[in-house]
Structures are given as C-alpha cells and as structure tokens.
C-alpha cells in the first residue's frame, strides 16, 4: 500500500430475526492486518448484505440484498442491488440508489466501469409452487414451477448510481433431481438453475457466470446486450459455484457438489474454456461439504478456498502451467450446517493478509500470509454480527 493511503474493509452482514446485524460495516485496517477498527456502519439497508464490489473511478460501492421479493406490492424490502458513494477521506458510505434484481436471491455483483455496466447473478430460491394443469386429453396433473435464475445487466450513470435494466438472461435446464447426495432444497437443489457468480475476465470483453444446477459455466460477450460466447458443460455432480481469474488469464473455480477446485485456460479471443486440472479440497473429511469462494494471491503462486462442512480454509500452489497442489489448511469455527458456515474471505490488495468473516463465531479475523509458502497465521479478531462478505478499498 502506498504511503499515506488508507485501507478500508467493507463487511456485508446478514440480518437474523430477533438479533442485531445486517447492513454494511466499515473498518479501517492496518497495512499488515494486525489492527481492525470499526469506524461506521450502514444498518438500515441492505439488511441482508452479501456480495460487494467497488468502482474505483466513481468511488462507488455496490451490494446485493440477498432476499426474495415477497410478492406483488411487496411488504418487506424487495430483492435488489444497491449503490453507495464512498467518502474519499473517511471511507464512510452514503446511499445513492437501488434497483430491483429481476430475479430472486441475488448472489453476486460485478462492475465494468469503462463500459458503465453492472451485472448481478440471481441464484433463485429452492422452493417450488405446485400448479394444477389439465392436459390435452382431459387429465389433471401437477406441474412444478421454480424461480427463474437470471443474470441482469444494468447501465450506470456518471455518478455511479445504478440505471435501468438493459438485458436479462434466463437460465434453463436442471441437473440430477431428486439427488439424495445433496440435502440442499430437500434433495431438489438441481431441479432448477442457480447462478452463483458473475465475474469480468481480465480482458474486459467477457462476463463469466457459474450455474450449478445444470452444471454449466456460461461466457457472455459484454456489450449493449448479453451475447452468449461459449458454454462449458461440467459432469453431473460437479456444482460450479465461484470463479476468479489470475493476472495471466487462467480461471479457477470451486465446485460445490464435488468438493473440488478446478483450473482452466481462458481463450480471450473466443471466450472458450480449456480444462487444466482439478484437486479435491478435502483431507479425509467424510461429512457433507460445500466449497464456497476462492481468492488468488497477487503473486499468482497460491489460490485460497474455503470448505463449508469441513470448515477449513485451504490453499493450493499454482504451477506456471496452471496445475494445482494442496499446500496447507487452517480450521475456522464449526458450523451447524454448511449453509450457515463461513462462506467468504478476501486477500488484502498487497496479499500480506487474509481477512475472514467467520460467521458461526460472529467475528472478523485476519491471518498473516506467509510470503514464501502461503501459510496462514492468526493476527487479530474483532466481534461483528453475522458477517458474510468483505470488499477492500484503498483511499
């Protein structure tokens, strides 16, 4: 971090009924991660803050509000994506505006500042409705309908506030249903699509979306509308969830159903993915496990991911050609269920430390990162209610 700069960590928190929490908390963080100081918070919106991203030119923070709109003329807040102006001196947040997400349970958000575009992946809920349908031959049958899972493209105004919806892609297909090996959705999680991540590739030409039910990775060309460039079909039982790129353009992906980490070569001329390697994220654990997020170290030598179930953070070394080798792990607080586990973590811009929102323990914890072996050593813990996601900003 440059001399005189201030490092801010924005922590998205989920509100839990009958407890405090929710909103976005603002921490000032020392360069080495040994000091975490709460300086302000936005509690009223979003109540179910999750994924965050930052537009440095506009100095605007974006957040999803992880919920399903409760019906026409909603009584509770609607499913939405929100924008906040970041004070360049203090890092405090001022609400700008919000837009509906055109889909339930927004899981992630990505910004393309040069093209003034914002994207959300809307996961959709697991619940279904049962419709009574009369067939052409006069029989009455049950029809099962699910939420649409979508990726939505918005325009951005000059001040970074969120404009109108420009395009929506509705995912189709399903995986194994019912699937006894996955208790998600009562064994029906793959019954309908669930998009989990949107990420812009390093070239700025493509948007990558992982959809875990039909086991697909979608690549869209970025423009005035979402143009499908390629689709990578994973084997059944994979569950592509989270993806990230290194500086060379290799893509890494966690697999929620298979408990694996994959690596790909990404062709920036066509948007095609070429599989390189995969490794198990587990070390003998036999219970239910669902990998979540991943982070790539700025030096490009290590990738970190977290297991929900085994409740660990695992890091892998990355060879020059993209192959993976498990290098170590640390435990985080035990969760009663993978859906309630620690689900995210974020490396500092310099890579000196990793910041983890340990959800079951209600703490924010920093780990020093070993520069040579990627190892993690606890530095500091501070209390915070139900933390979910972290976004660093240098001011």
Predicted regions and their residues:
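An edge-strand/N-cap motif at the start of beta-rich repeat modules
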Residues: 1-31
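Short loop/turn segments immediately following beta-strands, especially the blade-tip
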Residues: 26-34, 84-91, 153-164, 220-226, ...
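Short loop/turn segments immediately following the C-termini of beta-strands
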Residues: 14-16, 66-68, 123-125, 156, ...
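Beta-rich, blade/repeat-based domains predominating
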Residues: 46-56, 102-113, 132-133, 140-145, ...
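Beta-propeller fold detector
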Residues: 36-43, 93-100, 162-181, 228-232, ...
